[in-house]
Design a protein with these regions (language model features):
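N-terminal beta1-alpha1-beta2 submodule of the flavodoxin-like/Rossmannoid cofactor-binding fold
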Residues: 14-121, 131-133
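Glycine-rich, N-terminal phosphate-binding loop of Rossmann-like dinucleotide-binding domains
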Residues: 126
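C-terminal motif of bacterial Sec signal peptides marking the signal peptidase cleavage site
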Residues: 2-6
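Charged helix-capping and loop-helix junction motifs
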Residues: 136-142
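Short, glycine-/small-residue-rich phosphate/pyrophosphate-handling segment
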Residues: 154-169
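Short, conserved loop/helix-junction motifs that constitute active-site signature segments
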Residues: 116, 142-150
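Bacterial signal peptide processing site
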Residues: 7-11
Length: 169
């Protein structure tokens, strides 16, 4: 099952269609890919963009399924410094980053998009960490808030325990 939510930039409620998981579970993410983190991989349908961040690959697989179904552009949101493969080290870093975000300090990411003008819908996928949107995606959305204003956004998330609703408060 793939929960999704969407909104259209208005203040209306979303349209509806805990902890980071262990590798192989359902929180997404991943290693090196030789694509440029500022250029979406183009698909045949340029009206949609799938943005995602993923640590273990679960969210990435969901993003790829959407991309293949819609034949649209796709782009991975990557942290500036990759996460450790050590699970406990990753958990510590995730907790530190979430605490920093609550103080208004967002962790650095490599990914940026110059213009969303051609996209009708932007799909945003992320793992849920400690009940929250994964920090790389929080940073991306914070950095691109003005460029995304008024766009239709469709959320999808992977989680081993938490639901999507608390991750978008």
């Amino acid at each position: 099952m793939m929960p999704m939510a969407a909104c259209d930039g208005s203040n209306a409620d979303p349209i509806l269609p805990e902890q980071p998981g262990q590798p192989g579970n359902s929180d997404g993410g991943d290693e090196d890919d030789s694509t440029n983190p500022t250029n979406p991989i183009p698909g045949g349908n340029g009206r949609y963009l799938v943005l995602y961040c993923s640590r273990t690959g679960s969210t990435e697989r969901m993003a790829q399924q959407i991309q293949q179904t819609l034949d649209c552009d796709i782009l991975e949101v990557e942290p500036q410094t990759p996460y450790e493969s050590d699970y406990n080290g990753m958990l510590n870093r995730a907790q530190e980053e979430l605490a920093a975000i609550r103080q208004g300090n967002y962790p650095a990411i490599k990914t940026s998009v110059e213009d969303f003008g051609n996209y009708d819908i932007v799909f945003v996928g992320y793992p849920i960490w400690y009940g929250s949107m994964a920090t790389p995606m929080q940073t991306f959305l914070h950095n691109h808030a003005s460029k995304l204003a008024g766009k239709r956004i469709a959320l999808f998330a992977s989680s081993g325990s938490s639901g999507i609703s608390a991750s978008v408060d």
